Amino acid sequence: MRPCRSLRTAALAVVLTVLLHPVALGRATPGESEQNYLWQRRYECYASNGTQRLLDRCAYNREEFVRFDSDIGEFRAVSELGRQVAESWNLEYLQQARAEVDRVCRHNYELFQGLPVLLQTQPRVSVSPSKKGPLQHHSLLVCHVTDFYPGHVQVRWFLNGREETAGVVSTHPIHNGDWTFQILVMLEMTPHQGDVYTCHVEHPSLDSPITVEWKAQSDSARSKMLAGVGGLVLGLVSLAVGVFMHRRSKKAQQGCR
């Protein structure tokens, strides 16, 4: 099984997680009762202020049972299942585990530090009201920024070109489950006809900011716009059908000559 590596950032620390043999599925040996099991081993590296800390964590059926912490310097049981394992590994593998700080953590940290561009993912941005309602009624406008890495992002709201700072509520960056993040930034508003709200997003992966607009429209104006779009589409379809029939008729006439 190939190693799987991922780089994460956290407040005041860069966390490098290296999954070695992340999932091992097995079955009981012949003669024993048939039962599947899950074995996991994960190396976590924390880099802060020039120091490296290694956590070597082992889990059986998703429950951690033994752990090596380089700050402590030995394997320790996390559950009853890990007591004998910790004693055995401290006798057999302790020096090797202590050496992993340099082999796994420091080496991979320096490797990824040299590839900052590869560790940047551009965000996707969408804007929508929290609920539909008439104009001049209090509401929330939500700017959803997702799939970005690293986790630092700046999101600002503008109304008709002027920045809005009052009534802005934001979540903290949320992990998506891979190495990317998402964030919700909400603006309290009372929209009027013609108002233009703009979500302005700045991120290290972007050469220039992303801006997404939301225009306040009454239901009647929105209906007229949709009717206009529908009429335009219908007209284009009719034109295409007419051109097709004309060409078909022309070919038929040429074939009769």
UniProtKB/Swiss-Prot annotation:
Q: Mind telling me which Gene3D superfamilies this protein's record contains?
A: Class II Histocompatibility Antigen, M Beta Chain, Chain B, domain 1 (3.10.320.10), Immunoglobulins (2.60.40.10)
Could you list the residue ranges that cross the membrane?
Answer: 225-245
| Organism expressing this protein natively | Oryctolagus cuniculus
Q: Which residues lie on this side of the membrane: Cytoplasmic?
A: 246-257
What is any one of the record's Gene Ontology cellular component terms?
Answer: MHC class II protein complex
Q: Where is this region: Beta-1?
A: 30-120
In the UniProt record, the signal sequence range is: 1-29
Annotated keywords? Adaptive immunity, Disulfide bond, Glycoprotein, Immunity, Membrane, MHC II, Signal, Transmembrane, Transmembrane helix
List all disulphide bridges recorded for this chain.
Answer: C45-C105, C143-C199
Where does it mainly reside? membrane
Gene Ontology biological-process annotations: adaptive immune response; antigen processing and presentation of peptide or polysaccharide antigen via MHC class II
- Which family does the entry's similarity section mention? Belongs to the MHC class II family.
Q: Which SMART domains match?
A: IGc1, MHC_II_beta
| Chain ranges on the Extracellular side, renumbered to this chain | 30-224
**Which InterPro entries does the UniProt entry name for this protein?**
Ig-like_dom (IPR007110), Ig-like_dom_sf (IPR036179), Ig-like_fold (IPR013783), Ig/MHC_CS (IPR003006), Ig_C1-set (IPR003597), MHC/Immunoglobulin (IPR050160), MHC_I/II-like_Ag-recog (IPR011162), MHC_II_a/b_N (IPR014745)
Annotated compartments: Membrane
Fetch the Pfam families from UniProt.
C1-set, MHC_II_beta
Ig-like C1-type domain location: 123-211
**Under which name does UniProt file this protein?**
RLA class II histocompatibility antigen, DP beta chain
The ranges of region (Beta-2) come to 121-214
Q: Topology relative to the membrane, per the entry? A: Single-pass type I membrane protein
